[in-house]
Amino acid sequence: MKIGIPREIKNNENRVGLSPSGVHALVESGHTVLVETNAGSGSFFEDVDYKEAGAEIVAEQAKVWDVDMVIKVKEPLESEYTYFKEGLVLFTYLHLANEEKLTQALIDRKVISIAYETVQLPDRSSPLLSPMSEVAGRMSAQVGAEFLQKLNGGMGILLGGVPGVPKGKVTIIGGGQAGTNAAKIALGLGADVTILDVNPKRLQQLDDLFGGRVHTIMSNPLNIELYVKQSDLVIGAVLIPGAKAPRLVTEDMIKQMKNGSVIIDIAIDQGGIFETTDKITTHDDPTYIKHGVVHYAVANMPGAVPRTSTLALNNATLPYALMLANKGYREAFKSNQPLSLGLNTYKGHVTNKGVAEAFEMEYKSVEEALQL
């Protein structure tokens, strides 16, 4: 199989689809890998590293896309839609429930798109989303602490406080991978941390994990309002695989927050959980202020720490990439149910229910679409 690794073009996206070690594994399995010039430089992988791993380095972006399978990090931008072709396997994060134009382009060009975030194990965990959820969760607490500083628009609070001064209050909505990792860092900074989740069993697990050092609260509209309005930092970390994020925090709740408080919407790439995060921001211009509250809505948070993120992502995605390359997508889907759940579009059909519902499109199951 011929595989392409293009350079990411999203604002300040410095991750790369595969590290040199991942490329080497594919080449050793008999596949041809084309890597776009400087694709890995943002993660401090140079062209020579890929060349030594067995890749062919190409300067033309079109050539990297003229392959059997493209492995990326983030969803293609509009300038890349022109490279879509029937039968192309696209393996990347897609978050299509918030990307109607991209979804339509994939359907029109009959691309076989596999989204990292919807690959799901029997225990409902997301093995290809988890590494970046861990990174984004940990970053969210660090970023929140930074933007609480007065010079960054915040109210001038130190999350850990000092003797005789209260700690900063951090509320995390969602107790999954991202929320749990946000709590770890917030606790490490000395903050007063509350996690809200809809699953009582998960709250029990979190209570055990943190030894009672975090407040675990059932998530419902009344509790969300109560804890949001008294918080200095609110982190949104709710995920429904493949579907748009639920808007759990209303504009009225935001209006009740203190001036200079901060919200971090980790779920913004799926539409966000705050009614007031009505636009996606970038690493170049990461925040805006609405109702006196600092809003951080960067959709590719892990892109700011690309070396860590690329290595973590490569560890998770490489086994699936090898499966697709070695077996072909049909046999790979047949033999691996979690991978088949990653299929979002197939030759003109939407094969993810959450995406179909988001845009009122016709849905076909993977088995029906592929006639497995």
UniProtKB/Swiss-Prot annotation:
Biochemical pathway: Amino-acid degradation; L-alanine degradation via dehydrogenase pathway; NH(3) and pyruvate from L-alanine: step 1/1
Catalytic activity: L-alanine + NAD(+) + H2O = pyruvate + NH4(+) + NADH + H(+)
EC number, as in UniProt: 1.4.1.1
Entry GO terms, CC: plasma membrane
Residues the entry annotates as binding NAD(+): 169-199
Pfam families, per database record: AlaDh_PNT_C, AlaDh_PNT_N
Active site per database record: 95
First-tier enzyme category under EC: oxidoreductase
Annotated keywords: NAD, Oxidoreductase
BP term (GO), one: L-alanine catabolic process
Gene Ontology molecular function: any one: alanine dehydrogenase activity
Record keyword GTP-binding present: no
The keyword NAD belongs to this UniProt entry's keyword annotation: yes
Function: May play a role in cell wall synthesis as L-alanine is an important constituent of the peptidoglycan layer.
Similarity comment text for this entry: Belongs to the AlaDH/PNT family.
Record protein name field: Alanine dehydrogenase 2
